[in-house]
Amino acid sequence: MKKISLSLLFAFIGLSINAQTAEELKKEQAPKKVEIEKLQGEVNSLQDKIDALNGWKKGAFGTIGASLSGFNNWYSRTAPNASAGNIGVSINGYANLIEDTYFWRNSGTINLGWVKLDDESFDGDEGFEAATDVFTISSLYGRRLNKKWALSGLVEYRTTIIDNFNDLGYLDIGAGLTWTPTSNLVVVMHPGNYNFVFSDASTAFDSSLGAKIVADYTNKYGGLSLKSNLSIFQSYSDGDLSNWTFTNSFAYTIWNGLGLGFELGLRNNKQEALNNAVNLNNALAAPLTPPTFSTVDNKLQSYWLFGLSYAL
């Protein structure tokens, strides 16, 4: 009994010493945490001052996603011998020149995706097929009226690069005003904009004069980088010729510029919906009544990508 009591006593003493040691270490740790937070605040403040300096500012980040699989004599499947793959890559880059009297902002976005489902019992399905194909570049030049407003001109080009480069293609050229309430937000308002549409075969597309509105937000919160861009064209001649595109990119850095990324794109374009409906109708053995702008189902277009992110 005495041995048990002594053992319990020593165990209690040991726990008390460990508890005291932990409390002492926590007390010693607390002021150091305060110092780190203070230093981090100073670092962030200095970075804000650096970002506010004139001159060129460049950067890029993106997402890479991939999934590959293979089956050999896997008899529970309809196709026991098959391979599948899904690969996606996105790149968001910018190069901005900021001066006291003018600015020149350039940006580019690429999002490409390929998919494959190869049933080895059939020929002709061995390769990857394009799934996502987005290419956008823009250049905005502005002469400042004051700190937040500027007279500006914009050139924006959108197309695909895997399939049918410049078919379809969109080129916006316009002029108006640009509002920059902060260094991270740019809002373009151009009442004079011409939307050129390039298409080799389809008659569903027309170029037109209209208004262009672009809102672009780019920022970084600790390890999180984000970019949102809304681009709207409102045709003066016909609402069916209007379109908008909204893209959002997020990248969270975990280690040495690498982390997790997510990108989501939404788009509405009635001309593209009509062109797709016409092509599907023409492919029928017995084509139906040709679709028109008034009958076509203009569904919301979307794409997304999740995977490994990188920042340069």
List PLM regions with ranges.
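Surface-exposed strand-loop-strand hairpins of Gram-negative outer-membrane beta-barrel proteins
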Residues: 67-92, 118-128
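Residues on the lipid-exposed face of transmembrane beta-strands in outer-membrane beta-barrel proteins
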Residues: 64-66, 89-97, 139-143, 157, ...
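Transmembrane beta-strands of outer-membrane beta-barrel pores
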Residues: 64-72, 99-101, 110-116, 157-161, ...
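Cleavable N-terminal export/targeting peptides
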Residues: 1-54
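Outer-membrane pore/translocation modules
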Residues: 116-214, 288-289
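Repeated loop/turn-to-beta-strand initiation elements of outer-membrane beta-barrel proteins
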Residues: 101-104, 147-151, 183-187, 218-227, ...
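Outer-membrane beta-barrel "beta-signal"
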Residues: 298-312
